Swiss-Prot record:
It comes from Methanocaldococcus jannaschii (strain ATCC 43067 / DSM 2661 / JAL-1 / JCM 10045 / NBRC 100440) (Methanococcus jannaschii). It is found in: Cell membrane. One of its GO terms (cellular component) is plasma membrane. This is Uncharacterized protein MJ1079. It is a multi-pass membrane protein. The chain crosses the membrane at residues 2-24, 44-66, 92-114, 124-143, 150-169, 173-195, 255-277, 297-319, 331-350, 354-373. Pfam families: TctA. Keywords: Cell membrane, Membrane, Transmembrane, Transmembrane helix. InterPro entries: DUF112_TM (IPR002823).
C-alpha cells in the first residue's frame, strides 16, 4: 500500500515535468541523493516508474499544442501541432495517448513472451548484430540523401550530422546538452513561427474513430521499441524517425498512434531491461540499475500498468482544460513566453556545466532548426544530429 502512495507521488511529479518543455525526468533523477534517504529504496523505484511513465504521456500536451518536443517526441511533435492549428488538437492528444497505452500493453506482452516463454538470450543477440549497426545507419543516411527533394534538405542532413559529431561525439555531453539541442532544433524555430499566430482555431473536443490498423501500427512500433535494448546511443526519437521512413506511413492519424506507441514502448523496454539483462537504456532506467535493487517483475509490471492507466486519464482530461485556456489567450504571447522559458531552462541547467558552451550549442541548434523550417525541409532530417555520432560510436567499438 505504501509503494502505491509513492507511485502516485511519482505520477503527480511526472504530470508536472511533462507539462513544461525542457523539464525532464532526468532532472529529478539528478536529485536522487536528496530524495532517496527520505523515500527508501523500496519506495523510490515505484516513484521513478510513476514519474517517467506519466511524463511521456503528459508531454504530448506541449508537443501538440505548442510544437515543443523533447528528445523522445521530436518526430511526432510537428504532425500533432499541425492538427492543433487546424482545430483538431484534442484528436491529436487522444491518438497519441491511445497509441502510448497500446505501446505499454504490447511491450509488456512482448517482453514476457520473449523472456519468460522463449527464454530469448538478449545479450547473445546483441553481440551478434552489434557489428552491423553502423552500416545499417550509413545505408539509412544514403537513403535520405538520394530521396531528398531539394539541396536544402541535403544541407540540413549534413549540418545536423556534423553538429551532432561536434557536440555529442567530440565533446563531453551532459543532460542539458540534449535539452539544448532538441529545444533549439525542434522547439524554438516552431515557437518563432507561431509568433505570427494570434489565435488558434476553435478546437473540436471529439474522439477520433477507432480503426483496426491502429492496432497493427502500434504492435510494429512496439516491436521496433524492443530494439532499443540493443542500441545504446540511439534514442526513441531516432527509432521513431527510422520506423516512419520504413513504414512510409502517409495516414497522419495512424502515424501519430505509432509514434505514441514507440515512445512509451521505448521506456517500458528500458525499464524491463534492467530486470531481464541488468542494463538500463534511459536515464531513469540507468538510475534504477545503479541502485542495485532486487526488483520483482510483477511489481514492475503492476507499477507500469497503474501509472499508464492513471496517466492517460489525466492526459485526456487535462488537455481539454489547457486547450480551452489556450483559446482565450494571445497565442503569440504564449509562444513568446515559452521561448523565454525554454531559454532559461537551458541557461539555468548549464550554469554549472560550461554555460557559454551550451549557449553556443543552443543558438547553433536554433539556426539549423530555422533553416529547416524556412526551407520547408522535413524536420525529421535533423535527427541526424544523433545518427552521425552514433555511427562513429559503433565504428569505434
Amino acid at each position: 500500500m505504501l509503494n502505491l502512495l509513492y507511485l502516485i507521488l511519482g505520477i503527480i511529479c511526472g504530470t508536472i515535468t511533462g507539462l513544461f518543455p525542457g523539464i525532464h525526468p532526468n532532472n529529478i533523477v539528478a536529485l536522487s541523493f536528496l530524495i532517496l534517504p527520505y523515500f527508501g529504496l523500496d519506495n523510490y523505484i515505484p516513484f521513478l516508474i510513476g514519474l517517467v511513465i506519466t511524463h511521456y504521456f503528459i508531454n504530448f500536451i506541449p508537443s501538440a499544442f505548442l510544437g515543443v518536443p523533447d528528445d523522445e517526441t521530436a518526430v511526432s511533435a510537428l504532425p500533432m501541432h499541425k492538427l492543433t492549428l487546424n482545430g483538431n488538437g484534442y484528436e491529436a492528444i487522444v491518438l497519441a495517448g491511445f497509441g502510448s497505452y497500446l505501446g505499454v500493453v504490447f511491450s509488456i506482452l512482448i517482453s514476457l513472451f520473449l523472456m519468460s516463454i522463449l527464454h530469448f538470450d538478449v545479450r547473445a543477440f546483441y553481440c551478434s548484430i552489434k557489428i552491423f549497426i553502423p552500416f545499417i545507419l550509413i545505408a539509412f543516411i544514403l537513403y535520405q540523401i538520394f530521396t531528398a527533394k531539394s539541396v536544402w534538405e541535403v544541407l540540413v542532413i549534413f549540418l545536423s550530422g556534423i553538429f551532432g559529431i561536434a557536440v555529442l561525439y567530440c565533446s563531453e555531453a551532459f543532460n542539458i546538452t540534449l535539452t539544448a539541442i532538441f529545444t533549439g532544433m525542434f522547439g524554438i524555430p516552431l515557437l518563432i513561427n507561431n509568433l505570427k499566430t494570434y489565435k488558434i482555431k476553435s478546437q473540436m473536443m471529439a474522439f477520433p474513430d477507432f480503426e483496426l490498423k491502429f492496432l497493427k501500427s502500434s504492435f510494429f512500433a512496439s516491436v521496433a521499441g524492443f530494439f532499443r535494448i540493443f542500441l545504446p546511443g540511439i534514442s526513441g526519437a531516432q527509432l521513431n524517425y527510422i520506423l516512419s521512413k520504413i513504414l512510409n506511413e502517409r495516414d497522419l492519424k495512424n502515424f501519430i498512434v505509432s509514434q505514441g506507441s514507440i515512445i512509451l514502448s521505448n521506456e517500458v523496454f528500458s525499464l524491463l531491461a534492467v530486470i531481464f539483462i541488468g542494463v538500463g537504456r534511459s536515464g531513469v532506467a540507468r538510475a534504477i540499475q545503479l541502485l542495485n535493487a532486487n526488483i520483482n517483475i510483477n511489481t514492475a509490471i503492476f507499477s507500469i500498468l497503474i501509472s499508464s492507466t492513471i496517466a492517460i486519464i489525466i492526459l485526456l482530461n487535462l488537455s481539454k482544460y489547457i486547450l480551452l485556456f489556450i483559446r482565450k489567450v494571445n497565442f503569440k504571447f504564449l509562444s513568446l513566453f515559452f521561448i523565454i522559458f525554454c531559454s532559461l531552462v537551458v541557461i539555468i541547467g548549464s550554469y554549472n556545466t560550461y554555460l557559454i558552451y551550451h549557449i553556443i550549442v543552443y543558438l547553433t541548434a536554433i539556426y539549423i532548426g530555422l533553416l529547416a523550417v524556412k526551407s520547408n525541409t522535413n524536420l525529421s532530417n535533423m535527427m541526424n544530429v544523433l545518427i552521425f555520432p552514433t555511427i562513429l560510436y559503433f565504428l569505434r567499438g
